[in-house]
Design a protein with these regions (language model features):
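Short, structured segments at the rim of ligand-binding sites
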Residues: 1-168
Length: 168
């Protein structure tokens, strides 16, 4: 115990799928962002974002986020912009930096979104969106700010509390 020796190791930390999802989301709103360095053999639950993005493009899917809860805000945003979405496994959204389901509902409704938040499910209907008439609130949550920033790139507007992204 007292005479242990530390041996250096060299490891490469793989890219973060959760943060990559926010960047890749710009492409669904007619942007052009290249996301590089993601390992397809990753064990990160958030790597399913690419599959979920494809499903959001095609129809109003039901997506289980119980093992990738950090994707909740960006999937809610895309669901509003595309074809709607039913997210299940959402109860852990309430115990993050903010109650992410409620925070996204409040902010996305400023765009005209129609969202129902249940205990473990979020339902977002496809409705026309518009530029928000008021300043959005980042809810002191970096993932809320990042998801809203993607949508604001399409509609314009402002976010208060954007400094929360410094965590990312």
């Amino acid at each position: 115990k007292g005479r242990q020796t530390f041996t250096n190791i060299e490891e490469v930390v793989e890219a973060d799928y959760s943060n990559a999802a926010f960047l890749d989301a710009f492409n669904l709103l007619d942007g052009f962002v290249k996301v590089k360095g993601l390992k397809t053999s990753s064990y990160q639950g958030d790597k399913r974002y690419k599959k979920y993005f494809k499903e959001l493009e095609e129809n109003m899917p039901t997506l289980d986020i119980s093992n990738c809860v950090d994707l909740g805000p960006i999937l809610m945003m895309i669901g509003c912009f595309k074809n709607g979405v039913v997210l299940t496994g959402t109860k852990r959204l309430a115990i993050k930096e903010s109650n992410r389901a409620i925070a996204m509902k409040e902010e996305l409704e400023k765009f005209g979104a129609k969202i129902d938040v249940g205990e473990n499910k979020v339902i977002i209907e496809k409705v026309p969106l518009h530029k928000p008439l008021e300043i959005l609130d980042g809810h002191n949550d970096h993932r809320i700010v990042m998801a809203l920033a993607v949508l604001l790139s399409k509609f314009g507007g402002k976010i208060s509390g954007y400094e929360a992204v410094n965590k990312s």
